[in-house]
């Protein structure tokens, strides 16, 4: 369980995340964290959340966001909403570190997802770009309700269930 003020780092993608409001603090209503993106930082794959909205508020630099097929450049003071179910991805194409506040409503167990994926990447257990391996993604998608945008969700849930039944970690 994450704690406010706790910082985690993904050494592969160049992200530094500091938890501000956690699920336990907000009764599960909200997860909020400060995110720093080094130049070239990117989420390694487009994805969608089936149970949560995600909001970015840029503090410094700019963040490129693709929601569905539409691309946006978000500047300091601007916010953007990624509605649940809509595929999205983001990246920092600038030469400076970008900073933003990221919110998930409701919180669900998303903080656990970030702790897990940052840990896997920083331990060299993901693909070189920081994306989870097929087996990691299959196990985590149903656990955290984060899905690939093209493969039917019901199929991803079934595969995730099977993988989690046999997970020997």
Give names to the regions the model predicted:
Residues 1-30, 41-52, 62, 66-169:
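Jelly-roll (double-stranded beta-helix
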Residues 32-36:
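Short amphipathic
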Residues 56:
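Structured binding elements
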